[in-house]
Each structure stands twice: as C-alpha cells, then as structure tokens.
C-alpha cells in the first residue's frame, strides 16, 4: 500500500468517524469520548511503529486511525461550550486550534530530529503514541460539565 493510498483510506474513514463522534458527543460524556479517542489514537500509532508495513497492517492502521483522526473535534467543542459558554466556544476553540498547530509544528520538527539521529521515524511514532495515551488519561482530570466551580471564600 502506498503512502497516498494509506492517506486516502484514512480520509475516507475520517469522514465516518467524525460524523459518528458528533453523534456520540450529543449523547455521552465528552470527557470519556476523548479518553477513548486519544487512547485509541495512541494505540494506533504504537501499532504502526511495531508493524511490518504490509498491506494488511497498513490497512488496519489506516482504518482505525482514520476513524479517530478528527473524532476529537466534536467532544472538544462541546466541552469548550460547556465550560466557557456557547457564545465564546468559537473563540476558545480557535485558541485550541492555534495551540494544536504549534504542537504539530513542534512534533514535526521533533520527528525530523529523531529521524536524522536514528534514521527511522519509529521513535517519533512511539513517543506520539505514548503522548496520546497521556492525553487520554489527562482528559479524565477535567471537571464534569455542569458541576459547580470551586470558588475561594474569604476567611
């Protein structure tokens, strides 16, 4: 399977994964959805780094990674709206998107640096996979939307 074919399969499954994630985000706790989406994304990246890159292995990766590729957006938008209000959700998500781009640039630079040192992208895939799993656990630390905020009281 060529890189272009793999990316095409990812894109096709991304379409369905994102729509399904939107449907799920209207019905379930978005923190748990993000936990599963980031966790499965991390496992997909680690799987890719350990695979033999055969047609079947790349197809399995492309399907699972595609289903999850943009699936984090609907629950993230819902959490932003719940925390900051619907009128500010767009602004907040814009900042999240900007931060995402800075992270992507840093990750691309880091992957290139690792490639030049190790002559392979495998360490970069494994680090990205582990970071996704850390993100999955971190999402569970978010306060459940609709619960009261703790406000310090004067003594």
PLM segments and residue spans:
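Intracellular juxtamembrane helix-capping segments at the cytosolic ends
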Residues: 71-84
């Amino acid at each position: 399977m060529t890189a272009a074919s793999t990316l095409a399969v990812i894109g096709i499954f991304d379409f369905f994964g994102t729509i399904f994630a939107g449907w799920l985000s209207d019905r379930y706790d978005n923190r748990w959805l993000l936990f599963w989406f980031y966790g499965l994304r991390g496992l997909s990246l680690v799987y890719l780094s350990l695979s033999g890159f055969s047609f079947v292995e790349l197809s399995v990766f492309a399907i699972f990674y595609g289903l999850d590729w943009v699936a984090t957006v609907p629950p993230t938008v819902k959490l932003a709206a719940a925390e900051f209000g619907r009128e500010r959700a767009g602004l907040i998500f814009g900042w999240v998107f900007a931060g995402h781009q800075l992270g992507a640039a840093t990750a691309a630079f880091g992957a290139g640096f690792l490639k030049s040192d190790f002559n392979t992208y495998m360490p970069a895939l494994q680090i990205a996979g582990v970071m996704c799993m850390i993100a999955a656990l971190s999402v569970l630390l978010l306060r459940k939307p609709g619960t009261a905020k703790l406000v310090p009281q004067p003594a």
